[in-house]
Amino acid sequence: MSGHNRWSKIKRQKAAMGATKGKLYSKVVKEITVASRLGGGEPSGNARLRVALAAAREANIPKDTIERAIKKGTGELEGENYEEVTYEGYGPGGVAILVECLTDNRNRTAADMRSTFSAYGGNLGAEGAVAWMFQKKGVISVKYGPSEDQLMEQAIDAGAEDVIMLGDEGSEVRTAAADLHTVAGRLQESGLPLGQQRWVFLPQNTVALDVDTVKKLLKLLDALEENDDVQNVHGNYEIEDAMLDSLLQ
């Protein structure tokens, strides 16, 4: 597995336990609220809400918490009016970074992003500075299953674009952004044990980094993800597995 994918997986695992579990809950609940506000509270007619609800189940968020989040989005309960904002910038080593946020105070979040990038060796860019380097895709985690050839055949038949094998950690099925829910449904019908479903921004090209730059970059990524307004952080970095292993020891 590439260092980029492994680091992303490690971050998701860390978010599912310990002190960061509450932060994961908050992010998922925010997404449910916004998805409900934009597309309505019925999952059958709201693909974004379906993906958010799948993330809530994966995170074991209580049903009543989910229902309140939906009602806040539809206006049945009073709640914050979150705005979607994506910030773009560069990190150490010239790594391009996209930061997806949901905020109730755009000015506060912009100031936080600017100061965080600056404090950790990066700089916040203008809109469009790095977005062109990424493509939005759907990603479906498969916990275990058939051989690579069999999984590839099933995935392509279901409408997927690619399959990435992750060794003992299962595999990822990648789809066009608009096809995420459709492909996931077809794979589930075929009996595959699916995990998380999500949209990601995948880099078209990656930047290889030395160990000192990786250390600086990981500090920036951690700082960005600690911000309560941040939902997702994407970068075009590539970290060698051996290097990542040594840094995590």
UniProtKB/Swiss-Prot annotation:
Its main location: cytoplasm. It holds the Pfam family Transcrip_reg. The keyword Lipid metabolism does not apply. Keywords: Cytoplasm, DNA-binding, Transcription, Transcription regulation. The keyword DNA-binding applies. One of its GO terms (molecular function) is DNA binding. GO terms for biological process: regulation of DNA-templated transcription. GO terms for cellular component: cytosol. Gene3D superfamilies: 1.10.10.200, 3.30.70.980. It is found in: Cytoplasm. PANTHER family: TRANSCRIPTIONAL REGULATORY PROTEIN YEBC-RELATED, TRANSLATIONAL ACTIVATOR OF CYTOCHROME C OXIDASE 1. Belongs to the TACO1 family. HAMAP family: Transcrip_reg_TACO1 (MF_00693). This is Probable transcriptional regulatory protein MXAN_4974. It comes from Myxococcus xanthus (strain DK1622).
